[in-house]
Regions:
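Alpha-helical transmembrane segments
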Residues: 26-55, 367-371
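Hydrophobic alpha-helical transmembrane segments of multi-pass inner-membrane transport and secretion
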Residues: 12-40, 286-321, 349-354
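Membrane-helix entry/capping segments
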Residues: 1, 8, 12, 16, ...
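Transmembrane alpha-helical interface segments in multi-pass membrane proteins
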Residues: 300, 313, 321-367, 381-382, ...
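C-terminal membrane-exit region of the final transmembrane helix in multipass inner-membrane proteins
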Residues: 2-6, 383-414
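Short beta-strand boundary microenvironments
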Residues: 86, 90-187, 199-214, 234
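"Rare, low-scoring activations can occur
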Residues: 81-87, 167, 173-174, 198-290
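Intracellular coupling helices
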Residues: 4-11, 15, 306-347, 404-413
Length: 414
C-alpha cells in the first residue's frame, strides 16, 4: 500500500488528525512523567529501614501518671523490661527513646572534631539500656554492641552535661562515611555531639549497616543515626520495643499490654503500635500520590482510546461511498483494514514524536524545580509502544466495520 494517498487524504481533512496527534502527544508526556514519579515514590517507600523482619516488631509507649523519683523510675523500667521478657512469644526487648519512621524524636548535631565551627551532620539520637542491635536485628558491620557497664542511668531533671557524656556510641555506615569520608575504619574514633568546647565526646565502638532516622528523610541523611547506651528518668514517657515470634505479633502485643497494665503500681497510659504501621503512616502520602497518578494515567489512556475510536468511526461514516467504490474496484477487506490501520499509525507516530519532545521538556522542568531524577529513555520507548498499540486496538473496531461494508450498500444513492 502506498503512503502518499493516505497522506493526501489526511492533508485534505487535517483537523481531526491534528487533534488525535495532539491528544497522543499530551497523554504521552503526562503518562511517562507520571509513571516515572510513581516509580520514584514507590522506591522511596520500599527503602529498607535497617530493621530486620519489620512485621515482627512492635513497641509500647508507657506513661505513668505518678512517676516517682529517679530511683523509682529506674526500678520501674527494669521491672517492666523483665515483665515484657516473660511474655510468651517475646524474643527480645529493648528500652529506647524513639522509633524509626515515626517522625517524632531527638536529633543531635555531630562532628569529627570539637574545634569545628560547623557540624558534620545532624543525626538521629537513639538511646537504649539494652540491645537495639539484637532486638531490631541491625546488621553490625564493624565493631561490637554495647557492654552493660557502658549504660548510663541519668536523671533528666538533675544531671548536668558532664554526667550525660556517653561512654560509647554506635553509628550507621552512612554517618561514618559523612563524618570521616574515605576512612578504612572508624572504630576507636571519637564522635562529638555538638561543636565547640561544650561538645560531648563518645568513642565509636560499632557501625551498623543501616538504621533510618525517625524522619526517614529521602536524602542520604535519612540514614544518619547514632545509638548511645543510656537509661533516662523524667523524660517524656518510656518506650519498649519488642520482637515477637513469627506469626504471633497480634497475640503478643495484647499480652504485653495486659502484662504492663497488670503489674503497674499506679495509673498508666499504654499505646502499642507496630513498625509495619509506622511504615504505612510514613509513606501514606507517597502511596496516595502513586495511586492518584496511576488513576490519572489510566483515565488518559481511556480518553485517548475513545478519541481515536470516535475519530475513526466518523471517518468511516464520511467515507462510506469511497470505501464502496474501492470495494467495487476489487479492494479486499484486508486492504480496507490495512488502510485505516496505516492511517492511524501515521497519526499516532506524529503524536508520539511530539510527545517525546513534550516528555523531555516536562521532565526538565520537574528536574529544575523539584530536583527530580531525569526521565529514563525506557519510559519514552515504553510509552511510545503503548500508544502505538493503543492506537491499533482502538482503530481496529471502526476499521473492521469499514472493511465489511458491501459495494452495493456504500454506493447506493440516498
Amino acid at each position: 500500500m502506498e503512503i502518499r494517498p493516505i497522506l493526501s487524504a489526511l492533508l485534505r481533512s487535517k483537523t481531526g488528525a491534528i487533534l488525535v496527534a495532539l491528544q497522543v502527544a499530551i497523554s504521552l508526556a503526562i503518562l511517562s512523567n507520571a509513571l516515572h514519579i510513581v516509580q520514584i515514590r514507590q522506591a522511596v517507600a520500599a527503602r529498607p529501614s535497617g530493621l530486620a523482619d519489620e512485621s515482627s516488631l512492635f513497641y509500647i509507649q508507657v506513661r505513668h501518671l505518678r512517676e516517682g523519683d529517679h530511683n523509682e523510675q529506674m526500678a520501674t523500667q527494669r521491672a517492666e523490661t523483665a515483665t515484657l521478657r516473660a511474655v510468651q512469644g517475646v524474643t527480645s526487648v529493648a528500652f529506647t527513646n524513639q522509633m524509626p519512621m515515626t517522625r517524632n524524636g531527638s536529633t543531635n548535631s555531630v562532628a569529627a572534631d570539637r574545634k569545628q565551627v560547623n557540624e558534620s551532620a545532624g543525626a538521629a539520637y537513639y538511646y537504649t539500656a539494652d540491645s537495639l542491635v539484637q532486638t531490631w536485628g541491625l546488621k553490625l558491620v564493624e565493631g561490637r554492641d554495647f557492654r552493660a557497664d557502658e549504660v548510663l542511668d541519668l536523671d533528666n531533671d538533675k544531671d548536668d552535661d558532664n554526667a550525660s557524656i556517653p561512654k560509647a556510641v554506635i553509628i550507621t555506615r552512612a554517618l561514618a562515611n559523612k563524618v570521616w569520608p574515605g576512612a578504612a575504619s572508624v572504630i576507636g574514633k571519637t564522635l562529638y555531639f555538638g561543636t565547640g568546647e561544650g561538645a560531648q565526646p563518645a568513642p565509636v565502638v560499632g557501625v551498623v549497616e543501616r538504621l533510618q532516622t525517625q524522619g526517614a528523610e529521602v536524602s542520604e541523611r535519612g540514614e544518619y543515626s547514632t545509638i548511645v547506651p543510656m537509661r533516662l528518668s523524667h523524660g517524656f514517657g518510656t518506650t519498649y520495643t519488642m520482637r515477637a515470634e513469627a506469626g504471633q505479633l497480634d497475640r503478643v502485643m495484647k499480652e504485653a499490654e495486659a502484662a504492663l497494665q497488670r503489674t503497674a503500681t499506679g495509673p498508666v497510659i499504654l499505646r502499642a503500635k507496630t513498625v509495619s504501621n509506622d511504615r504505612k503512616d510514613r509513606y501514606r502520602a507517597d502511596n496516595a500520590l502513586s495511586w492518584m497518578l496511576i488513576t490519572v494515567s489510566v483515565l488518559l489512556l481511556l480518553i485517548t482510546a475513545s478519541g481515536i475510536v470516535g475519530m475513526a468511526s466518523l471517518w468511516v461514516t464520511q467515507r462510506r461511498k469511497q470505501i464502496g467504490v474501492r470495494r467495487a474496484l476489487g479492494a479486499r477487506r484486508v486492504d480496507i483494514l490495512r488502510y485505516f490501520l496505516t492511517e492511524n499509525f501515521m497519526i499516532t507516530s506524529v503524536g508520539v514524536a511530539a510527545g517525546v519532545l513534550l516528555s523531555i521538556g516536562l521532565n526538565q522542568l520537574l528536574v529544575s524545580k523539584l530536583e527530580m531524577a531525569k526521565l529514563p529513555v525506557e519510559y519514552l520507548l515504553g510509552g511510545a509502544g503503548v500508544f502505538w498499540l493503543l492506537g491499533a486496538l482502538a482503530v481496529y473496531g471502526p476499521a473492521w466495520r469499514a472493511a465489511t461494508i458491501s459495494p452495493a450498500t456504500a454506493t447506493r444513492s440516498a
